[in-house]
């Protein structure tokens, strides 16, 4: 009898030890992910493609589906411009990543207010929210347009300070143990530079510096007019896909993605000591199946600046048009967009001329003062002049307004000029 009890006890120990190293690692129950494609419209195909691909990678690595929260407008897969109805691809191999993706927030629910509510676990978001606690690790991935101090959503913008304040709230309320953020957007570094504390267990990387464009890739598909991926996003997703994440650190991925994303300068912010941690703590620890990557990932090609994509996509639609009527209509639209681009440029030049007559402040603003100023100024500019969602190319000019705030000009003076120029 004694030997039977002893044998059962030993067997239990062995089974527990085996379970700790099984593919369904119990530790994966303490991982949460929030994936955000912040755009809509077929010319922004790549953002939803990035999120769909990332979703499948996290699932394959062991993150529980109930712990993945997705934001996607969901207007791409069944878009009339999509020659492959019901499918979304992320490179020229045309592997469908849309199938199986559970979208928690779509359409008008893809907005900054709901996003911040989800992060805080606020049930007023109306759907799945982050329920992480002090022992949980969180991964946030965002892809869309950006400008200094903002990330764009379909109808509104997320400003840097409210985002950083939300992250601080999560820390104060012990809503995570460690948190990692990846951001794909033009000027994405401006969301964190000088703003993200280095002592709250948050590690962030961005596709670009605070003052440069990010890049799209796979932009010349023979049948799809839009770009299929973002360069930084595709690089990190494929890097996670092909490696065993229990043996690959955050810094190893950062350095590899920085090397591969050779058209912009990938940046790193926050607690850089976290770079020694393994990716498995945030993206899952399951071993890849032996057949999972028989076909090696594609090398990104045909990359262009994100700001040039609206015109690039329109040029490709003209080339792919099946009849002269469609081609003529698209040519007219192209002409209007080129005129709009010139109008934006002229508008910013006139604003510069008016600002020349405003007395220059004696000292520059602090980073906090700059962010407070630019939030007010951007809202006025988008109300009176142009919205990012209507004219993504304005992101290349908004740095002008940011620079005025940075130099210490008051939001009141800048907005006074904006009203003179744009009415």
Curated annotation (Swiss-Prot):
Q: Which N-terminal residues, if any, form the signal peptide?
A: 1-18
Q: Where is the active site?
A: 145, 186
Tissue expression, per UniProt? Answer: Gut.
Record GO biological process: proteolysis involved in protein catabolic process; vacuolar protein processing
EC class, as a word, reads: hydrolase
* Pfam families xref list: Peptidase_C13
Keywords, alphabetical: Hydrolase, Protease, Signal, Thiol protease
Q: Name one GO molecular function term.
A: cysteine-type endopeptidase activity
Which reaction is recorded as catalysed by this protein? Hydrolysis of proteins and small molecule substrates at -Asn-|-Xaa- bonds
Region of interest (Disordered), residue spans:
286-307
- Matches recorded under Gene3D superfamilies: 1.10.132.130, 3.40.50.1460
State which residues form the propeptide. 19-29, 286-423
Listed under GO cellular component are: vacuole
InterPro entries in the record, alphabetically?
Answer: AE, Legum_prodom, Legumain_prodom_sf, Peptidase_C13
Described purpose of this protein according to its UniProt entry: This protease is used by the parasite for degradation of the host globin.
What family does the database annotate?
Belongs to the peptidase C13 family.
Question: Mind telling me what this protein is named?
Answer: Hemoglobinase
Q: What is the lineage of its organism?
A: Eukaryota, Metazoa, Spiralia, Lophotrochozoa, Platyhelminthes
Gene name as annotated: HAEM
